[in-house]
C-alpha cells in the first residue's frame, strides 16, 4: 500500500477510512514502514513514506498497519502479498502467519522487528535467513521465514528455498 509512489500517506488514510469495507494484507513495503517507525532503522533515500512518519495521525496509521494480517482466508483462496511455500498446507500458512501477527500485536514489537531485520548487526545480513523451511527452526527463524515468504519472496524453488534478488519479468 505504501512506498509505491508519492501518495503513501493519502493512500493509507483512504484505506483506513474505509474501515470494515476494505481489508488488506501486509506487504513488504508496509512492513518496511513499520520497521522504520518502531526501530532505529532510518528510511532509505528512495522511500516515499516519510510523510507518514511525520504526520499527526502517524500513531493511528501505524497501529492500523500492525493490526493487518499477513494472510486473508477467503472462501476458496488465501490472499498474501508474495507467496506460500510449497511445503506448507493451508493450516501451516495460517498458523505461521498468526504467530507473526501475534508478535506484531505484542508488547515488544520494536524488539521483534529489530530481530527480524538484523538491525543490531546489519553485517550479518540475517533478514533473508533462513531461506529454507524446517520444523526444527527456532521460533525467531520461523517468524523471519514466514515474513519473507508471505511478504518478500520473488520466487520459491520446489524445495522451498526463497529467492529475493530477481526483480525483472520472467521470460
Which residues does each predicted region cover?
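Conserved Walker B
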Residues: 1-2
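Active-site neighborhood of divalent metal-dependent phosphoester bond hydrolases
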Residues: 5-137
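Alpha/beta-hydrolase fold catalytic core
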Residues: 113-171
Amino acid at each position: 500500500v505504501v512506498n509505491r509512489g508519492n501518495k503513501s500517506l493519502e493512500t493509507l488514510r483512504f484505506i483506513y477510512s474505509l474501515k470494515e469495507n476494505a481489508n488488506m494484507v501486509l506487504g513488504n513495503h508496509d512492513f518496511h514502514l513499520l520497521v522504520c517507525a518502531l526501530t532505529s532503522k532510518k528510511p532509505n533515500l528512495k522511500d516515499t513514506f516519510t510523510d507518514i512518519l511525520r504526520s499527526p495521525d502517524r500513531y493511528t496509521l501505524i497501529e492500523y498497519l500492525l493490526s493487518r494480517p499477513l494472510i486473508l482466508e477467503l472462501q476458496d483462496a488465501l490472499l498474501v502479498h508474495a507467496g506460500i511455500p510449497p511445503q506448507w498446507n493451508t493450516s501451516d500458512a495460517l498458523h505461521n502467519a498468526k504467530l507473526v501477527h501475534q508478535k506484531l500485536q505484542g508488547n515488544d514489537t520494536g524488539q521483534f522487528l529489530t530481530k527480524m531485520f538484523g538491525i543490531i548487526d546489519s553485517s550479518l545480513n540475517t533478514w533473508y535467513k533462513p531461506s529454507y523451511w524446517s520444523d526444527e527452526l527456532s521460533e525467531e527463524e520461523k517468524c523471519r521465514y514466514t515474513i519473507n515468504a508471505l511478504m518478500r519472496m520473488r520466487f520459491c524453488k520446489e524445495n522451498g528455498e526463497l529467492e529475493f534478488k530477481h526483480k525483472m519479468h520472467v521470460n
